[in-house]
Amino acid sequence: MRRPGQSALALALAGLVASVAGCALPDGEWFGAVPTPDPTHFRWCNSGEPEYIDPLLASSTTDLKVVYALFDGLTSYGPDGRPMPSLAERWESSADQRRFTFHLRRDARWSDGAPLTSADFVYSIARLLHPLTASRNVEAGWKVRHGRAYTDGTAKLLLADAPPLRAGEVVEVLPDGDAPPPDSNLRRARTPLALRAAPDDNTAAVWGRVPAGGNVTIIELGGADRRFAYLHHAAGADGVYGWAPLAALDAPHDAHRYQVRELLDAVAARALPVDRRRTATALGRELLMLPELLGVSAPDPYTLVLETEGPTPTLLDLTAQKALRPVPRQAVSRHPRRWTFPEHIVTSGPFQLTHWRQRDRFELVRSTTFWGRSEVRLERVTIYSLGDQSASASLYHQGGCDATVANNVPAAWLPALAGETGGTRRRDYTRAPFLGIYYYIVNTERLPNAHLRRALAHALDRSELPALLKGGQLPSVQLTPGTPAAALTAADRALCGLAEDSPLHALVVEAGLCYVPAPGPAFDPLRAQEELALARAELGEKFPTRIGVKFNTGVEYHKHIAEWAQEQWRNHLGLAVDLEAQEWKTYLKATVAGEYDVGRFGNIGNFPDPEEFLSSFRCASPDNRTRYCDPEFERLLDEAELEPDRRRRLALVARADARLLDAAPLIPLFVYTQHHLIRPYVRGLDVNLVDQQDLRRVSIDPAWREAAP
């Protein structure tokens, strides 16, 4: 069972943290005494309590350490962080990079023994894109043909002829007069209800009536009698589900007429000099939102076909990440709000969840149904949910865990661990590059004036950050992380067009292809004062008297950086700044709700591509916490997504990047480095640019001393 509360471990660590942090770190070859390992059990110190372990909802690095142990994908992350075959044994793509065919393993199983088939991917991608799911990862699904329109509720399947349109066509629905477009999946009342039903004579789009206050999920088509719809009403802990006759359901919009037009794919639409899409009228009952209209199909149980809006050479890179990992329909349908609890969860990865105690730990055991179970060396995995760096590193020091996740060590300890304070560099400490950027987000609804936001950005002297952070981080005015010019090879510098002494960094996307991210406002106190004066003139009495900065607890340098920014803005701009620390989950909810002025944030890329870092600033992105919305930024990214030439695509992305940074809804601060503590007996816990580890490769070597140099 998952139970809230503070564990005995956390209480015991309180005194331990004080004792370790209160004095200089003891010198030695290793950080703490190396315990005698259990060759079957791996203990991992995570950086906090996951917000979600549902792959479609998980978004933070804290979530993913658990998610990737439990759920498999078409591909998984290899030792270098790039995709390698997993549930998909092989794949091929069309010459225009718009159709991708994956051939699935026939021995893949869910943990309840059910076969894992292509239908599970179709279901999961439709669930990802469904507006009721409200996934912050939905942009990954927008690559799929009609994905964006499906989320927006504007793409429908026409169920009856409406000349010149024919039944079965995917159409875009437009309002007819003042009537809103019909939404076949939402009931226009206090409680939404998702419904699916196939056409039966003239009965198609329907609305259901459920008790007030109930929650909702998805209704699946099924059964021989098409006059029945399967509905799921999630009430209380588990909910109820079953079949309901269509005659018992409301259909308030079925008699409304709507303008409908053919929905061309984005490439065809762009090619038309004039909008010549056919338009007709249809009844609400003749329109239905169905997953079948998406560019996702399952020709047979072991073949999955994905069709995209435009050329998508990066699609394979997306197949390893959380949003495209399948979820079990059989568990989600029965327990929509509790399906990830140990007593209900059904998984597909190398490990199964047996115990979850909130703010304490996850207990996992080797899966007996995982297709690659013979390759899994561990019998047990314990993942501690330690939302405090000092507690995590202290538990490691005392032999309580075998490794820490990236950057779960206090910044003040890093110089000693690296041997930079005169002692010995600890052999179990690793520092490595990281495809991640740390920045401040600015709520553009609370601070709508771009001059004020630019003043904040120009007033920060980022050159002071390395001394504050102590971990080799790279100060940055660029959003997309990369490699400093001085650290690039001569050939890559030539490719990127950078001199060795350039203050900029660059991202080598692939061999022969380089992206130099656009720089944002750099430190310039005079320019900051000029922008501030313009802001005061434009805002007048609406100029804010105080600005708030929020950050999450658990990582000590978030507070240090906030105090540094507070001082910089006071000294260079004369602004009064209030600081507020919040627990991790509370902080996430506050930023999503827009309850902040300035907040700390970070983004770790899944693969080396600048769109990984720009997409969350799109107008409709569920993860757009800044509320920034710029039609020209949207247009440039839309055009880039459809551009088959990769160099021209990056040129368009660079223009969007520059426009975003000039508007300053975010303020880049530094490129992350990653810091790990890993016991010498741990094997296969890969340190790579994207910080993704596959626990199926991890093992414990009890004879490590014999192999040590």
Residue map of PLM features:
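Long beta-strand-rich cores associated with HINT superfamily self-processing modules
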Residues: H676-P709
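Extracytoplasmic/peripheral linker and loop segments enriched in polar/acidic and small residues
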Residues: P35, R426, P433, R454, ...
